[in-house]
Design a protein with these regions (language model features):
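Structured, non-membrane catalytic/scaffold regions adjacent to prosthetic-group chemistry
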Residues: 1-185
Length: 185
């Protein structure tokens, strides 16, 4: 699927992220917190793979045809987690994005970044990557420039765009897009 024809869904808009000032932070239950530039990531343990995924909202009534396949290139998530040194007792890895929206929490409107999580076991799968290229081109803005999490075999919502932080923790993450929307039971 071409970059232009690959389906688009976002929950909080499309933030502008500057490649030159971009930083990815790795925090939480790690031995070494990381603060990585785009260049750091592009010079890491790079893999390339053909991966397709679809929107979790696909149906005959609401959304239809939100599916795509592309050639992705990026650094392995495992290499980043290994460099940070995930501590014993860690259970989940939370992926925070640059896109921010309003959520109502206990009757108050609060700014929250889009986020999804994976169990440690799912996060360390060798095919997971932090993608910076799509179909041989730098990752387009509308597909998550400069870095997008790619989790082959999962619905599109798990493939967090505009990634800014990876946080390792010992509890389940229960943000809106894990605990209320897109709930997996």
């Amino acid at each position: 699927t071409s970059n232009e024809d690959f389906y688009l869904v976002q929950h909080y808009g499309q933030p502008e992220v500057d490649n030159d000032s971009y930083r990815l932070r790795v925090t939480g239950m790690v031995d070494n917190e990381l603060d990585l530039s785009l260049s750091d990531l592009m010079n890491g343990d790079v893999i390339e793979q053909e991966v397709g995924f679809e929107c979790g909202g696909n149906s005959q009534r609401l959304l239809y045809g939100l599916i795509g396949n592309a050639n992705w290139r990026g650094v392995t998530l495992t290499s980043i987690l290994e460099a940070a040194g995930v501590q014993d007792g860690a259970k989940e890895v939370v992926f925070f994005a640059a896109d921010v929206g309003q959520e109502e929490i206990r009757g108050r409107e609060v700014d929250k970044a889009f986020a999804r999580s994976l169990s440690i076991e799912d996060a360390i799968r060798p095919e997971n990557m932090l993608a910076f290229e799509m179909n041989g081109e730098p990752l387009p803005h509308y597909h998550g420039k400069p870095i997008r999490l790619l989790v082959p075999g999962w619905y599109g919502v798990a493939n967090v765009k505009w990634l800014t932080q990876i946080h390792v923790q010992n509890t389940r993450y229960m943000g809106r897009f894990m605990g209320r929307d897109y709930v997996t039971l």
